[in-house]
Amino acid sequence: MAQPPRLSRSGASSLWDPASPAPTSGPRPRLWEGQDVLARWTDGLLYLGTIKKVDSAREVCLVQFEDDSQFLVLWKDISPAALPGEELLCCVCRSETVVPGNRLVSCEKCRHAYHQDCHVPRAPAPGEGEGTSWVCRQCVFAIATKRGGALKKGPYARAMLGMKLSLPYGLKGLDWDAGHLSNRQQSYCYCGGPGEWNLKMLQCRSCLQWFHEACTQCLSKPLLYGDRFYEFECCVCRGGPEKVRRLQLRWVDVAHLVLYHLSVCCKKKYFDFDREILPFTSENWDSLLLGELSDTPKGERSSRLLSALNSHKDRFISGREIKKRKCLFGLHARMPPPVEPPTGDGALTSFPSGQGPGGGVSRPLGKRRRPEPEPLRRRQKGKVEELGPPSAVRNQPEPQEQRERAHLQRALQASVSPPSPSPNQSYQGSSGYNFRPTDARCLPSSPIRMFASFHPSASTAGTSGDSGPPDRSPLELHIGFPTDIPKSAPHSMTASSSSVSSPSPGLPRRSAPPSPLCRSLSPGTGGGVRGGVGYLSRGDPVRVLARRVRPDGSVQYLVEWGGGGIF
């Protein structure tokens, strides 16, 4: 039976409602509430925790870790301690049956017993091998796996290499997504634990399976988050030690990789070039393994990085575009940098596709060129008259004032949609770029992912009500959070927000004092701030950026007055 899909933690108690009785056939690990266990995480490492809830139907446990965080962990990723009296009971098949050639062997470390055929790879019989003691696969991986790469020397490194020649699960039986980035069974790497492809994992070029950094023994430097600029071949495909080769990076790839790594670690969207981007790159210059770029003098690194950030508008967004400091840079989309297929004499011709999120080999965004449309021509007898590009003929734009005013009128006259069933309706701004960080959009009642991970990319801060987003744009502070409007708005902000409320059918209209936001936009107020009627009467240009329905049924619009632009 296939493992159930990855579950999410929820604050509601309905997650632990009595479920249907679990089937009695098949092995069942002995897990109970209050038991201390080791849980394997998405980084390939084991962490100590205590079981709080056991769900036999879903085969998951709610585990509380040493930092008081609680997450759901699949049974297959939990390693309990051996119990007294079970020395003759196989911890895999839960059977005491012994036949010739398939005897029970006990691990010297954890004292768990295994049938020879139940262990992967097959365990030696008692008395066989170099010594009389034997260590199981779980203990070897628990000792040898490390952040930055597993042990490369010593007896446990040699034992781990022998264990890695076979996988503890069927690779062909995994259900992968379209991009071959994640599978339904949450089985990755040599350890068989969970994982996230964009967080320090390497993909084998032959079998396309993903492997944790902590379980590999071939890396000379630790990985950065989202770094896929490697040719990697696992022990299973090679039948021996792993093989890895660094791909050549360009300056745009270096800038993208550094920004993605910083955004994952710091949970921010924008970073100062002189205070964060350049110092991080300089301090980790040798660890980046830049190949030909590593010989770049220190004086040229700043100009090369800055040029890459400014010349690739499809990847990066600067603070100048959002009315912030021009030295701030962020990613348009929080995705790892795309990887080109290897080329040249050192490239392997059998390198398959599947590096990009879409399943094919991703090309660098900076080199995409759209074919320009040919100009329209009108044929007449004896001559051909040029009409210009198609957009200039077919889409003759109206004057800006008329077009924006018509847009506002259509938005205001639109029918009111029914209120959202969720009391926390997230706000989304203009289509294009979302200024709010991903973690800040996780409201207190929204579930988080099951395997959030202990690395800096995972945090439960988004689920606590007293933690707000670390950085908000002035526009977002006004429309999304009217209760914490700053006393003085920046002078560079030219957009203001207007609230237009309409009662929903069947819902009584609530009488409440106007918020500071509504008072600041009401007609007749001082300070040179006019309401929507005043702007329309003066003929000022207007643009509707967004529309949302509040829990009480009222409709609010985010309106930009005066022709200023933030995008």
UniProtKB/Swiss-Prot annotation:
Task: Give a GO biological-process term.
Answer: DNA repair-dependent chromatin remodeling
The encoding gene is PHF1
Disease per record: A chromosomal aberration involving PHF1 may be a cause of endometrial stromal tumors. Translocation t(6;7)(p21;p22) with JAZF1. Translocation t(1;6)(p34;p21) with MEAF6.
List locations, semicolon-separated. Answer: Nucleus; Cytoplasm, Cytoskeleton, Microtubule organizing center, Centrosome
Q: What is known of its domains?
A: The Tudor domain recognizes and binds H3K36me3.
**What task does this protein carry out?**
Polycomb group (PcG) that specifically binds histone H3 trimethylated at 'Lys-36' (H3K36me3) and recruits the PRC2 complex. Involved in DNA damage response and is recruited at double-strand breaks (DSBs). Acts by binding to H3K36me3, a mark for transcriptional activation, and recruiting the PRC2 complex: it is however unclear whether recruitment of the PRC2 complex to H3K36me3 leads to enhance or inhibit H3K27me3 methylation mediated by the PRC2 complex.
Residues of the region (Disordered) are 1-31, 333-441, 455-537
Species of provenance: Homo sapiens (Human)
Task: Look up the domain of life of the source.
Answer: Eukaryota
Biased composition annotated in UniProt, kind: Basic and acidic residues: 371-386
Instruction: Supply the name of the protein.
Output: PHD finger protein 1
Q: Which PROSITE patterns match?
A: ZF_PHD_1, ZF_PHD_2
Q: Which Pfam families match?
A: Mtf2_C (PF14061), PHD (PF00628), Tudor_2 (PF18104)
Per the record, what is the consequence of mutating W41A?
A: Abolishes histone H3K36me3-binding and localization at double-strand breaks (DSBs)
